[in-house]
Amino acid sequence: MSKLKELPLSALQFYATAPYACSYLDGRMARSQVATPAHLINADVYSRLVRAGFRRSGIFTYRPYCDDCHACTPCRVLVDQFTPDRSQRRAWNRHQHLQALVAPLTYVEEHYSLYLLYQSMRHAGGGMDQDSRDQYEQFLLQSRVNSRLVEFRDPPGSPEAGRLRMVSMIDVLDDGLSSVYTFYDPLERNASYGTYNILWQIRQTHALGLPHLYLGYWIADSRKMAYKARFRPLQVLTGNHWHAFEDLGTEAAEAAAPVPPAPQA
């Protein structure tokens, strides 16, 4: 890579936030390492940061930087080697009729309404069910990298044609896709929208000829994050190197075995 292309990454500064309450593990405090300034984090730089374990929330690019905890483990699916298990095949068959539309990050009132409904039923009391439109847009619709919004609706000719079922945000990297966030209709019983969304993203990553789908952080002791271990083969970032999930050891693999609630990106 030329020096000109390396310049934005070398010009970045990193700082640690003050401790705050962890949103994944009760009773723990968390810190983040934040990459700045945001205007230097273009698609190329962001791809490299993701490979180093960073994520983004809006234009805020960060990775866990906790004092006494290393539970958040970056993970990615090797899409060329992925084979769905039986429950994943059922989820695909149940929802493959949905019509997907890929679009730029754009505010749609219907999306915002579904987001609030999803938060109120899946994460009641967490505060995000009270997000204003500005907070929603800052969280999901602001990006300085190559980002897309995907909406899933019931197809024409179906009993509820056009009904919005799910919305997903993804980033396009130079070596894969990164799943940013997903919310869906929480009212339909027996749906597997979260699982279907990841399967759809795996297929899209493969169709683009890219090797990895980044799923954010796997956390063994968090039921809403441990589901990611169900998508194999999975790699995890430890010690600045990507390793097979199985290399974490038997205890870590067993911790992810129980089937948790539907996924959160």
Swiss-Prot record:
It is an enzyme of class 2 (transferase). GO terms for cellular component: cytoplasm. Its main location: cytoplasm. GO terms for molecular function: arginyl-tRNA--protein transferase activity; leucyl-tRNA--protein transferase activity. This is Aspartate/glutamate leucyltransferase. SUPFAM superfamilies: Acyl-CoA N-acyltransferases (Nat) (SSF55729). One of its GO terms (biological process) is ubiquitin-dependent protein catabolic process via the N-end rule pathway. Belongs to the R-transferase family. Bpt subfamily. PANTHER family: ARGININE-TRNA-PROTEIN TRANSFERASE 1 (PTHR21367), ARGINYL-TRNA--PROTEIN TRANSFERASE 1 (PTHR21367:SF1). It comes from the Bacteria. Functions in the N-end rule pathway of protein degradation where it conjugates Leu from its aminoacyl-tRNA to the N-termini of proteins containing an N-terminal aspartate or glutamate. It comes from Cupriavidus taiwanensis (strain DSM 17343 / BCRC 17206 / CCUG 44338 / CIP 107171 / LMG 19424 / R1) (Ralstonia taiwanensis (strain LMG 19424)). It is found in: Cytoplasm. Its EC number is 2.3.2.29. It catalyses: N-terminal L-glutamyl-[protein] + L-leucyl-tRNA(Leu) = N-terminal L-leucyl-L-glutamyl-[protein] + tRNA(Leu) + H(+); N-terminal L-aspartyl-[protein] + L-leucyl-tRNA(Leu) = N-terminal L-leucyl-L-aspartyl-[protein] + tRNA(Leu) + H(+). Keywords: Acyltransferase, Cytoplasm, Transferase.
